[in-house]
């Protein structure tokens, strides 16, 4: 009995001695660069193997005294090495396969699509970056980028009136202190006053990954005090891929209440002024307006609908990659809120507001990449993001009330042509360039608000109807030149210089009309209760309406920038220093200037923006970082225009001189 126990213990000890973990790295024998995605297989046990990570490393469990590793990667010669069990870490060099073949382009998969790849991008990044992979986005229930981004570290979102996430707040700083990129290129905003981009216009399913940068380097645009949000759109896969998704749901809020809607299809897109100009007597009548869009309905909404379609493939011996994707989202949202007014203001007490909102989003993008050869690549991206929202806001307090019927349409178009070129041995010299055309547009035609006193429409100032639209057009070019210098001892210098130029043009239009009610009492012929059928109210417009508003302007902005940056890498240390210079030329022209305001204005300024970053690799999965960067916050176009807003919930005035 004792001999059996001893035999079992000896067997367990023997197994424990034989089992172990071998760690290693696979590098290019000529350049010393780590090879990502190389295959490592145990020759004696072909079923046991792994692939190298983003830093070229691998871990492999073995249970032999001696074994042979077979290492291979496309474009390199297969390499076999015998390893003893007591050797815990090795470095394996792969030599380039110089056999002459017909030209073949090898396309690797995007590592950022997986969680492991996203974490690798974060570790290898020069600055502080958080990445959400396509896999994580697919698993989340969020249908817009605005809701996806709130799941990232150090990021919160600002919601709109219907409760939907809309703008990103980075590091606790207001939305104006960050900017938005698509595939590394800044895009314009459809907002009529500000620069920030609403992230709810982007369907999340069109993303390859989402990056949030919290510290700027010199090769990034300098107006991001809070950071930058970069949307990397789906790229062509390595093999044919076709996906379809369809989902539905229902907003539980409408189990207990009806959805308020209005006939937004009857809205006339152009105001009377846009249709016929200024009349001779400076007056308009109700014949110049339609009231069909003021008819409201109360019913149960249809279920939400989400649909998506994408197709990707590679052609011409993998030289040409194509990714086509489309998305459709139709959702019904609602919210109940309270607005508190300070004593002594226009309103007193609390205003209770109920929101009903139908949001329709359409997204389409096409991304093509062409590999001329192993050293030269062209990419052409075209994207169209569209959002339409029909919203009813029903507000009231103890005495007064107001109902607003608003339809808003926004879209962003972006077309970017990029080139990536490598020169010299091992691609030591690299040149990247981009040519960009973008447009953002927003329109809110016939935004109607009707004011009530109890069950009656106010006689004076019974309603306001306004037309607004604006567009933002960008033409931009980017150029980056990078050179890698490897020294004896393993240290590496990376030198970068580059610049960008952007020409932005913005136009904004605003036209508002005030109406009185022809009668202040409820007429029995009007249907419904509490003046719900607003299209039957007898309104009378006051004179012509207001077009002398600061929101009627044309503006231009020209930005030129250049930078220089150097990165030094030695063992676990990485130092990055750079400086960026940006010159800004802004100007505006008021279309209908009022008295005591400047009809034109211009300003020019230059900013010098240094940055310095240090990274120390404590562990393969952990880094210590220090970052310093100087950045700016440019005023929006509306902020340099002398303006005064008196028809919102509060009064606002700016730049009187």
Can you annotate each of these PLM segments?
Residues 27-31, 38-43, 72-76, 89-138, ...:
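Short, acidic, small-residue-rich periplasmic hinge/interaction motif at the N-terminus
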Residues 400-421, 547-560, 603, 632-657:
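Outer-membrane beta-barrel signature, preferentially recognizing the C-terminal barrel domain
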Residues 59, 146-186, 227-228:
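Extracytoplasmic beta-strand/coil segments of soluble accessory domains associated
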Residues 59-61, 157, 185-214, 259-261:
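Short acidic/polar hinge/loop motifs at secondary-structure boundaries
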Residues 186, 388, 441-447, 505-507, ...:
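Surface-exposed extracellular loop regions of Gram-negative outer-membrane beta-barrel proteins
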Residues 46-57, 83:
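Short, acidic Ser/Thr/Gly-rich low-complexity loop/linker segments typical of extracellular
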Residues 92, 201-245:
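A beta-strand signature from Gram-negative outer-membrane beta-barrel systems
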Residues 291-393, 413-415, 612:
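Transmembrane beta-barrel wall of Gram-negative outer-membrane proteins
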């Amino acid at each position: 009995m004792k001999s059996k126990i001893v035999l079992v213990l000896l067997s367990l000890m023997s197994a424990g001695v034989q089992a172990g973990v071998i760690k290693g790295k696979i590098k290019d024998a000529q350049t010393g660069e780590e090879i990502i995605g190389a295959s490592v297989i145990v020759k004696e046990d072909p079923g046991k193997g792994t692939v190298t990570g983003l830093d070229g490393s691998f871990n492999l469990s073995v249970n032999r005294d001696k074994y042979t590793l077979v290492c291979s990667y496309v474009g390199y010669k297969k390499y076999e090495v015998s390893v003893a069990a007591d050797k815990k870490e090795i470095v394996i060099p792969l030599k380039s396969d110089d056999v002459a073949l017909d030209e073949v382009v090898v396309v690797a998969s995007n590592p950022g699509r997986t969680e492991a790849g996203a974490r690798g991008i974060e570790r290898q990044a020069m600055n502080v970056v958080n990445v959400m992979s396509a896999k994580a986005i697919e698993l989340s229930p969020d249908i817009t980028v605005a809701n996806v981004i709130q799941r990232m570290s150090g990021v919160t979102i600002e919601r709109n009136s219907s409760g939907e996430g809309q703008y990103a707040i980075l590091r606790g700083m207001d939305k104006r202190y960050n900017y938005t990129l698509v595939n590394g290129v800044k895009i314009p905003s459809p907002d009529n006053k500000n620069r920030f981009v609403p992230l709810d216009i982007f369907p999340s399913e069109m993303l390859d990954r989402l990056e949030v940068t919290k510290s700027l380097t010199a090769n990034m645009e300098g107006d991001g005090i809070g950071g930058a949000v970069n949307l990397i759109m789906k790229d062509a896969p390595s093999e044919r891929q076709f996906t379809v998704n369809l989902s539905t749901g229902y907003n539980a809020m409408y189990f207990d209440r009806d959805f308020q809607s209005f006939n937004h299809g009857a809205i006339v897109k152009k105001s009377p002024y846009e249709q016929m100009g200024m009349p001779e007597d400076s007056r308009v009548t109700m014949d110049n307006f339609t009231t069909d869009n003021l008819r409201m309905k109360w019913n149960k909404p249809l279920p939400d609908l989400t649909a998506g379609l994408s197709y990707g493939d590679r052609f011409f011996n993998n030289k040409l990659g194509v990714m086509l994707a489309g998305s459709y989202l139709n959702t019904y949202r609602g919210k109940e809120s309270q607005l508190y007014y300070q004593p002594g203001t226009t309103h007193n007490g609390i205003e209770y507001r109920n929101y009903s909102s139908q949001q329709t989003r359409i997204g389409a993008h096409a991304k093509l990449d062409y590999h001329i050869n192993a050293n030269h690549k062209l990419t052409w991206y075209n994207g169209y993001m569209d959002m339409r929202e029909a919203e009813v806001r029903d507000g009231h307090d103890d005495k007064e009330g107001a109902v607003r019927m608003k339809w808003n349409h926004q879209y962003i178009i972006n077309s970017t042509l990029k080139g990536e070129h490598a020169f010299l041995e091992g691609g030591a010299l690299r040149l990247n360039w981009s040519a960009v055309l973008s447009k953002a547009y927003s329109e809110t035609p016939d935004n109607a608000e009707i004011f009530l006193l109890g069950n009656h429409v106010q006689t004076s100032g019974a309603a306001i109807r306004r037309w607004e639209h604006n567009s933002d057009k960008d033409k931009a070019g980017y150029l980056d030149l990078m050179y890698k210098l490897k020294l004896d001892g393993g240290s590496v210098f990376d030198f970068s210089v580059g610049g960008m130029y952007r020409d932005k043009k913005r136009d904004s239009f605003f036209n508002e009309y005030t109406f009185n009610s022809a009668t202040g009492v409820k007429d029995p012929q009007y249907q419904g209760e509490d003046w719900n059928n607003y299209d039957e109210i007898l309104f009378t417009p006051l004179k012509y309406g207001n077009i002398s508003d600061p929101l009627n302007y044309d503006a231009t902005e020209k930005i030129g920038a250049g930078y220089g940056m150097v990165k030094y890498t030695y063992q676990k240390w990485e130092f990055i220093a750079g400086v960026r210079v940006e010159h800004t030329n802004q100007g505006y022209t008021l279309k209908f200037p009022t008295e005591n305001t400047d009809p034109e204005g211009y300003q020019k300024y230059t900013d010098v923006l240094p940055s310095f970053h240090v990274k120390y690799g404590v562990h393969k999965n952990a880094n210590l970082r220090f970052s310093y960067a100087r950045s700016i916050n440019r005023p929006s176009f509306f902020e340099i225009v002398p303006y005064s807003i008196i028809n919102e919930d509060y009064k606002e005035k700016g730049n009187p001189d």
